[in-house]
């Protein structure tokens, strides 16, 4: 008879597991001991944005933070180079150790998909919109791997950045539609001093492109302040900023409601942009208030609304 034993776990230290069965056994034992499991899924190449998610997760009382590092092949399209995605595992582990993370899950493709990809999660119509229109199959790959991570780790909460707002919305849709008992927590976008959203892709920008990339966040901020005049006013203001940078090839610039349905005539909304600089594709978004819900002075409302981040510059 084979007696299964829980893999070793050292509290207060960084524990790295690659086998799904091992991390599942450890998190199950921790839950039995009364600890809460919180998950931060990543593809590695960690930057301050990822570490902000980790810090938010660590604020959960009684939590053990699990960070997964897995470059998921399912979310790469035929024209996207999976092999070119940056892999910096040793640097990532050093950063996570400094943050006090106790569990890192680093599976391989064969660990996650031992029998191939026979089953996947269909994201519905929203999965083919916005990002999905230029990256077919991307969100099916994202939802499939995240659902697998949920099944393996069994977290109480999972933390995701608002920079990938469509992804965040689809994950909330998935857990609601499939009755997945995990709370999805969105964390505001982390930005450079000029407003550029942190992204692993920023490393591909040369000096000139890095300067030009600041136009995305500037356009969003212009749209935010113009939104009192309606969705079209927000788009016009944002477009005027983007047009000043001919090197930017804009894929889309849209206003949507918070669940990414059609733009509202009035109320809370999201302004989203995607553009290319050379071979690098960048995305960003910002919460806006459309129409009469904006302040009477024409500036966006600022208050206790947890869905809205403050402007990052005046």
Curated annotation (Swiss-Prot):
Keywords for the protein's UniProt record, in alphabetical order: ATP-binding, Cytoplasm, Ligase, Nucleotide-binding, Pantothenate biosynthesis
**The keyword Ligase is annotated on this UniProt entry:** yes
The UniProt annotation places ATP binding at: 43-50, 161-164, 190, 198-201
- One cellular-component annotation, GO: cytosol
Query: Where does the chain bind beta-alanine?
Result: 75
A single GO BP annotation from the record?
pantothenate biosynthetic process
For (R)-pantoate, which residues are the binding ones?
75, 167
Q: Sorted alphabetically, which Pfam families does this protein's record hold?
A: Pantoate_ligase
Q: Does the keyword Membrane apply?
A: no
Q: Which CDD domains match?
A: PanC (cd00560)
Superkingdom, according to UniProt?
Bacteria
- Residues of the region (Disordered) are 112-131
Principal location: cytoplasm
* Active site feature: 50 (proton donor)
**Pathway listed for it?**
Cofactor biosynthesis; (R)-pantothenate biosynthesis; (R)-pantothenate from (R)-pantoate and beta-alanine: step 1/1
GO molecular function terms attached to this record? ATP binding; pantoate-beta-alanine ligase activity
Query: What InterPro entries does UniProt report for this protein, alphabetically?
Result: Pantoate_ligase (IPR003721), Pantoate_ligase_C (IPR042176), Rossmann-like_a/b/a_fold (IPR014729)
Q: What is its EC number?
A: 6.3.2.1
Query: What family does the database annotate?
Result: Belongs to the pantothenate synthetase family.
Q: What does this protein do?
A: Catalyzes the condensation of pantoate with beta-alanine in an ATP-dependent reaction via a pantoyl-adenylate intermediate.
Q: How does it assemble?
A: Homodimer.
What further note is attached to this protein's record? Answer: The reaction proceeds by a bi uni uni bi ping pong mechanism.
Q: Which PANTHER family does UniProt cross-reference here?
A: CYTIDYLATE KINASE/PANTOATE-BETA-ALANINE LIGASE, PANTOATE--BETA-ALANINE LIGASE
Protein name in the entry: Pantothenate synthetase
């Amino acid at each position: 008879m084979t007696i299964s034993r829980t893999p070793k776990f050292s509290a207060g230290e960084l524990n790295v597991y690659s086998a799904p069965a091992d991390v599942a056994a450890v998190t199950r034992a921790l839950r039995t001991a009364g600890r809460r499991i919180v998950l931060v899924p990543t593809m590695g190449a960690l930057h301050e944005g990822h570490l902000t998610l980790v810090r938010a997760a660590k604020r959960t009382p009684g939590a053990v933070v699990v960070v997964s590092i897995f470059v998921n092949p399912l979310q790469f399209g035929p024209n996207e180079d999976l092999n070119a995605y940056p892999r910096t595992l040793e640097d990532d582990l050093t950063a996570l150790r400094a943050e006090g993370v106790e569990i890192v899950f680093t599976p391989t493709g064969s660990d996650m998909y031992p029998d191939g990809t026979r089953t996947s999660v269909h994201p519905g119509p929203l999965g083919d919109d916005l990002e999905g229109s230029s990256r077919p199959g991307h969100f099916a790959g994202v939802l499939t791997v995240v659902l697998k991570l949920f099944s393996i780790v069994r977290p109480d909460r999972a933390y995701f950045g608002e920079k990938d707002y469509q992804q965040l919305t689809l994950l909330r849709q998935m857990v609601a539609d499939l009755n997945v008992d995990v709370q999805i927590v969105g964390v505001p976008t982390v930005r450079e001093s000029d407003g550029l959203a942190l992204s692993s892709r920023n490393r591909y920008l040369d000096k000139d492109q890095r300067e030009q990339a600041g136009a995305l966040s500037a356009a969003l901020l212009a749209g935010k302040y113009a939104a009192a005049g309606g969705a079209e006013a927000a788009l016009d203001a944002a477009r005027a900023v983007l047009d000043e940078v001919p090197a930017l090839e804009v894929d889309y610039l849209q206003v949507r409601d918070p669940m990414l349905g059609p733009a509202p005539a009035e109320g809370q909304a999201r302004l989203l942009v995607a553009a290319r600089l050379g071979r690098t594709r960048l995305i960003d978004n910002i919460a806006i208030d459309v129409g009469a819900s904006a302040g009477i002075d024409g500036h966006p409302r600022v208050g206790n609304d947890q869905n809205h981040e403050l402007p990052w510059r005046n």
